[in-house]
Amino acid sequence: MMESFSETKSSIATNKSTTPTHEVQISKELQDIKNEVFELKKSHEQCKEKGIKVKKDINDVFKHADDITNTLAKHEKESSQLISRIKHLNAKEKQLDITKELSAHLDQIKVNVKRAKVSFTPETGSIFVRLFLGQVNVKHMRENEKFRLKQEYEKFKKKTNPQFILFVVLLLLYPQSSFVTTSWQIWLLYYYITLALRENILLVNGSSIKPWWIMHHYLSIAGSLTNLLFPLSESFSYFLPQVTYFSGCQGLVQILTNRYQQGRLYKLVAMGKANIIDVTGESEGWGNDPGWTPSALFLFPFLLFVQFFQLYNSFSFFAFAYQRSGYVEWQVFSCGFIFLCLGLGNLLTTLSVYYQKWKNFSKYNKEN
């Protein structure tokens, strides 16, 4: 009893001795936290003030950009008027040199104004962009914003191309499911609209995209919409397996094409022969690069296969319509025409690109 009592007494004494130390530690920790909170608050206030200043500076920058745009428009108008006045002058022979010199100066001013307007004039894009976004400026002033646009475009293609394969698997597993079929049709429409919209915005911001690929996606949008409006009839059931197989082949070839184009584009950007926001390695401005590589040759037969598959689809739709004596849905003729345009356009573009590659390769070998 006495021993336990003494132990209890000693433990109480120990607790009394440690309690002040513990309280000191807590007080010190609270003081440190208090100091950090005040430092954070001070830093936040400074950041807030800096943000207000930066916002004002940005507004001033855009105001100056608007002033520059208005001045450039004024210069363009004045230079045109002066050129017109010079043309209407009945200058004598000894004054011809002066008028030619002045005309040359004015022509150079017009060229410079045109180049400057590309950088400073806001753009709303094509009719297609305005249809979805309205009259808003889609041009970015900062290079990192332009590059982000391109990155997001590449990410979108990388994420969505495998979905071609996924929908093919689902359509083969559930060929009679209207839910799967409708989901696939809606997804195709969403895919091509998004691609066309992003490419139009990239085009405004200086990206190099062949006009055919923009037109290709417009035609694909029309085809996807036609497919979505196709009633679940005999003709739809007849063509569904064929179009499903085509979609799977197209998805595989697009995956291969994107890998090749990104690899070549990175190489050309590193060599200084391409713009960092370009989306393919097939720009006409890169004619000095041979591009005749094993990967390009490997891709060639796959591209031809898909393009001839498109032409075969077109023939199948028209042949089906020709063989039927009764009523044939307008979607059959529409799909046949769209596949014909896509097949011919893709085939001619591919042959043109590879012919240019061969010419560049031959020229490169002769020079080296």
Swiss-Prot record:
The chain crosses the membrane at residues 164-184, 186-206, 212-232, 236-256, 291-311, 332-352. Its main location: membrane. It is a multi-pass membrane protein. Keywords: Coiled coil, Membrane, Transmembrane, Transmembrane helix. Residues 25-96 form a coiled coil. The keyword Membrane applies. InterPro entries: TMEM120A/B (IPR012926). It is found in: Membrane. Residues 1-23 are annotated as: Disordered. It comes from the Eukaryota. Pfam families: TMEM120A-B (PF07851). GO terms for cellular component: membrane. Belongs to the TMEM120 family. This is Transmembrane protein 120 homolog. It comes from Dictyostelium discoideum. The gene is tmem120.
